[in-house]
């Protein structure tokens, strides 16, 4: 049956060539590529296409579990969707093959560690931001809204929808500025 490959990197700066070569060597006839974050299933149209169109007996091939998902929950959602369709998941660089009991167990353990790694990275980032704030060198991102501009437009009689559209913000933000939430 068909083997469908999926290659993913986090940014466009990273190269997919090694993953694509490994997937070709694994016998993948079709390879979908994506350069998106693996932190969520949202915003990954190539992955969703595979999950929507894979058939019973086909194998979804990745190089490593972390190329597919960064949380156990997302990993389980993917595996459940594949299982419901009668398809399997195989990782070329790890002994994860959902068609075997041992492969399923190993796969779940890798998912736990991928989630753990993501949580550690978030903790380190939060610690770094806190330390930078203490030293006065981290200010956060600049505010997206121009409170004065919103108030001026409101005084001129413009409606919240037009203001939001023109300034690229949500209507709710306009209402909050009008109420005085953003002082």
Curated annotation (Swiss-Prot):
**Covalent S-S links between cysteines:** none
Query: Could you say which residues are annotated as the site Ancestral active site Ser?
Result: 10
Print the keywords alphabetically. DNA integration, DNA invertase, DNA recombination, DNA-binding, Plasmid, Transposable element, Transposition
What range(s) does the Resolvase/invertase-type recombinase catalytic domain occupy?
2-136
Q: What family, per the record?
A: Belongs to the site-specific recombinase resolvase family.
Example GO biological process = DNA integration
Task: List the GO molecular function terms.
Answer: DNA binding; DNA strand exchange activity
Q: Which InterPro entries match?
A: Homeodomain-like_sf, Recombinase_CS, Resolv_N, Resolvase-like_N_sf, Resolvase_HTH_dom, SSR_resolvase
Can you say what this protein is called? Integrase-like protein y4lS
**Organism for this UniProt entry:** Sinorhizobium fredii (strain NBRC 101917 / NGR234)
């Amino acid at each position: 049956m068909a083997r469908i490959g999926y290659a993913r990197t986090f940014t466009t700066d990273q190269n997919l060539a090694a993953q694509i070569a490994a997937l070709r060597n694994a016998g993948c006839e079709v390879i979908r590529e994506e350069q998106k974050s693996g932190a969520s299933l949202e915003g990954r149209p190539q992955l969703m296409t595979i999950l929507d169109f894979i058939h019973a007996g086909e194998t979804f091939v990745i190089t490593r579990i972390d190329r597919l998902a960064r949380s156990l929950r997302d990993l389980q959602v993917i595996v459940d969707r594949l299982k419901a369709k009668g398809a399997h998941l195989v990782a070329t660089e790890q002994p994860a093959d959902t068609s075997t009991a041992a492969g399923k167990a190993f796969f779940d353990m890798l998912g736990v560690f991928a989630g753990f790694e993501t949580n550690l990275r978030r903790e380190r980032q939060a610690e770094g931001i806190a330390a930078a704030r203490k030293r006065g060198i981290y200010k956060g991102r600049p505010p997206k809204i121009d409170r004065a501009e919103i108030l001026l437009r409101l005084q001129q009689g413009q409606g919240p929808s037009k203001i939001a559209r023109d300034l690229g913000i949500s209507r709710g933000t306009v209402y909050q500025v009008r109420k005085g939430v953003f002082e």
